[in-house]
């Protein structure tokens, strides 16, 4: 095996665990707000659970609980969808320095809402 191949394999072996660790979120109840398009911010909680390869997120706001789908945790982003009233909404939240997430949620009609999530204490 050539030295350059060995070096590349070594670098990848070190980088892979770091990238996997960066994709973890703290399980538990996160707090924050949901701001619908043209609406006021609503206090919310977000129940985040992981078991093996399964990730679940439940949004609780305005007396309703909605399960998220298509959840993807990346190093710097959290992506998911949810369907309030049957209309699909796609969210892209960015991880902040304080480990919170915030970002936009877009519906099929082009309406934009905002979600902020702060990790459990």
Predicted features along the sequence, with ranges:
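Bacterial N-terminal signal peptides that target proteins for export
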Residues: 1-10
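Bacterial N-terminal signal peptides
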Residues: 9-18
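Central antiparallel beta-sheet cores of small beta-barrel/beta-sandwich binding domains
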Residues: 24-121
């Amino acid at each position: 095996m050539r030295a350059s191949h060995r070096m590349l394999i070594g670098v990848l072996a070190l980088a892979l665990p770091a990238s996997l660790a960066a994709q973890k979120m703290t399980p538990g109840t996160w707090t924050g707000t949901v701001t619908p398009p043209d609406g006021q911010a609503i206090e919310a909680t977000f129940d985040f659970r992981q078991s093996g390869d399964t990730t679940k997120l439940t949004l609780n706001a305005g007396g309703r609980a909605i399960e998220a789908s298509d959840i993807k945790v990346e190093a710097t982003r959290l992506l998911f969808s949810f369907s309030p009233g049957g209309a699909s909404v796609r969210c892209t939240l960015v991880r902040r320095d304080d480990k919170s997430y915030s970002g936009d949620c877009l519906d099929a009609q082009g309406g934009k809402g905002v979600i902020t999530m702060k990790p459990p204490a």
